Amino acid sequence: RGTVKEAESHDADVILKSFDAGKAVFHFDNREVAVPLKLRGIYNIYNAAAALTLTRAVAAERYNKKTLLEALGNVEPAFGRGETLMLNGQPIELVLVKNPSGFRLALESFPPADYATMIAINDNYADGRDMSWLGDVDFESLRELGVAQVTGIRAYDMALRLQYDEVEAAAVSTDIPAALQQFIDSHPDSPKRIYCTYTAMLKL
């Protein structure tokens, strides 16, 4: 308990200082700590900072910092949330997207450099039927390399949205399995990343 003024002036228990692929730096207990992470995406890193804060608050003086950081570093990505699969020696990253803020953060979290990119958009009930939110996503980060494959029920709507941001879509198909195979065959030696809605991900 405390006054509103006291609550407003309370220093953050955990501060996320920086992050990049495979590592985040947090400031807590008056020092900066670099933590190797299996999680990807800034939204997952925010969740990691929240988990550190909650655990320290609940456990108070009883928490073991070494054990806590090791446990955090061993957390695996949830299905499709930055999950990485290996195929023929190359990674395929699955990035679930379901709203404009999530898609924007995903694009910010996963730089397109050196990656072949595919986007799979369905509008089934579990995805949400209204895909107009794609208009609120900035796809300019994909402009330089373009998108290798666009697929899903709303493939042509997605391709049109990319065109508005001057992002080239090399191939467009509503047939997800066929599009996936073409994507893999066309980029055998490249790491790959697929942004997908929920039911599109289940088809991959």
Identify the meaning behind each predicted range.
Residues 1-100:
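Adenine nucleotide phosphate-binding catalytic loops in nucleotide-utilizing enzymes
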Residues 78, 90-91, 96-174:
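Active-site beta-alpha connecting loops in nucleotide-dependent enzymes
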Residues 47, 51, 148, 194:
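Residue-level signal for inorganic ion chemistry
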Residues 58, 110-115, 183-191:
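Glycine-rich phosphate-binding loop signature in dinucleotide/nucleotide-binding domains
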Residues 50-53, 57, 105, 109, ...:
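Alpha-helical scaffold segments in soluble metabolic enzymes
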Residues 43-44, 98-99, 154-156, 198-202:
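Gly/Ser/Thr-rich loops at beta-strand to alpha-helix junctions
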Residues 16, 128-129, 180-184:
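Short, charged, surface-exposed secondary-structure boundary motifs
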Residues 178-204:
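A glycine-rich beta-strand to alpha-helix segment
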